[in-house]
Regions:
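Catalytic metal-binding core of the metallo-beta-lactamase
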Residues: 1-105
């Protein structure tokens, strides 16, 4: 018989608000614009956010990026959180060299 981990279930049910994602994009954009790598920016955000669900997802994104995925590909792996429109804008920014601008557009 499995024991339910209620804290894990509660965490999965916690939503990530649009405002929280906007802060995520702004934080990453500011750091990338300042010359910080995506990995360092993701790590910085996960250290600073109070949203435990978003922190968990950013740690997952960090692992995908660390293994070689571009940010857009890492986000595609979390479709319940990041929609196609967001990902398309980020992917265009990666391809054009304007990622920091695409994160806040």
């Amino acid at each position: 018989m499995a024991i339910l981990d209620l804290s894990a279930i509660a965490l999965r049910l916690t939503t990530i608000k649009t405002q929280d994602k906007a802060l995520f994009y702004e934080h990453i954009s500011n750091l990338v614009e300042g010359g910080v790598t995506i990995l360092e920016a993701l790590s910085s955000f996960s250290d600073k956010t109070d949203n435990l669900r978003l922190k968990q997802e950013v740690l997952t994104i960090t692992e995908f990026v660390r293994s070689g995925d571009p940010l857009s590909t890492a986000l595609k792996k979390l479709p319940r959180i990041f929609d196609r429109g967001e990902i398309a804008v980020i992917e265009a920014g990666e391809q054009s060299g304007t990622l920091q601008r695409s994160l806040v557009s």
